[in-house]
Amino acid sequence: MNHEIIEQRAWLMGTLIAIVISIGGLVEIVPLYMQASVISPSAGTKPYGALQLAGRDVYVREGCYLCHTQMVRPLQAEVERYGHYSIAGETVYDHPFQFGSKRTGPDLARVGGRYSDEWHKIHLNNPRDVVPESNMPAFIWLAKGMVDPAEVAAKMRVLRKLGVPYTDDDIKSSAEVVTGHTELEALVSYLQGLKYNGEAGQ
């Protein structure tokens, strides 16, 4: 087929472009859904607890993902700094995933357990109290905002429809778990849960 015939007919060129993109997309995407390692949780991966889930939503609402990633790349420097590189099975319960796109601040995929709860609270209230050169904003209002138990239960029901294995008991007990907790405590709980749960040596 002469290329001039295609170039002179916009509808034909558009149709051929759509066909090529569709085939390319299928070739790239479909195999991923056939790999169990991509769609199955990795060893030790569990759904977020009620307080962690509330904290994850605070993390998203405050735009933390704009400056922090949650994906350790398989590069020597990153593995030495942050720990085991991220694997697909770690994020199967993340809706939406929190890979992020820019590292103004450090990667948080392995931050759980590195610092105390108190350190995180001080850091979130005024980052420069613990990291003098930090350009992170202070989130002082989180200590005043309370977690809404009804909202957490509703989110857990929605996530269950998306495939997260929350039980009826998990949802019923969520109100008791989060009642009386501030958004600051919820965010700290979420951050403390960000760690590699796979088997040693993997």
Label the model's feature ranges:
Residues 13-22, 80-184:
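Electron-transfer interface patches adjacent to heme c in soluble/periplasmic c-type cytochromes
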Residues 27-32, 69-71, 76-81, 135-136, ...:
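Short, solvent-exposed loop/turn and secondary-structure capping segments
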Residues 36-60, 72-79, 104-106, 174-177, ...:
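Electrostatic cytochrome c docking/interface patches
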Residues 1-48, 162-167, 188-202:
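Post-cleavage N-terminal segment of exported redox proteins
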Residues 55, 61-70, 120, 187, ...:
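The canonical Cys-X-X-Cys-His
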Residues 32-43, 53, 69, 88-98:
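Sequence context of c-type cytochrome heme-c attachment sites
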